[in-house]
Amino acid sequence: MYEKIEGGSVIDIQGLKCNLPPEGYVFNIITKQVEFRGVYKRSEIQSEQYWKRIPLPSWYLDTMKKWDEFDKKKKDDEVEFYDEKLEEYKKQEWDRRLNGFWYMNNGEPTFLTGLHYLYLQWWPIDIGYPKFRIPDIEKFYFMEYCIQDPLCMGMLEVTKRRFGKSFVAGLFVSEYITRTKMTNGGIQSKTGSDAKKFFAKTVVNPFRRLPKFFRPEYDMSLGVNPKTEMRFQRQT
């Protein structure tokens, strides 16, 4: 969003010139290259082209159950569970989480940042999974620009109630620290009690419902539903 991308487009969000990759392409943050991924379509009929959570593969639930059963019996020195189809699916979803995702929206190719894709596809809120909204896509573009701008110290958001900002904030504080070593995230609220409620509702509950391949191990000595902190380390 911050750096210009050759062949891409620019959209102005509240004065920030956000740089989108060319249609069907993403900037791979690992290879540092612009790479083709294509544009996902849920239908060839334009009126049916809108965001809807992408269905899980037919084999997914059964394979995840086998993984859980394997881990319950596995000893520390044994090899990890492996399933070829699951590995490909994990790579796909990690790629979308890190690099973004294109899909067709009423005939218009639409780019979601990786954080926005994770929010829509995998981050449950109090009424199910989030819906796609234009103000949200602009917010995630703006947020990604701020993250990438080396001179930016943060952003301020002023909005009305019931606009989903709490769950987006919960995702924001969780996403980076769940994939980065030696990293902390914090929550500040009106009171300590309010912060605990926010933590339980917008961090712990959605985190526990993430797929296993997005969910690092955490210290269970604080409970399955910790009240004040999550430590991403194995319990000894």
What are these model-predicted stretches?
Residues 1-236:
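Phosphate/NTP-binding elements of NTP-utilizing enzymes
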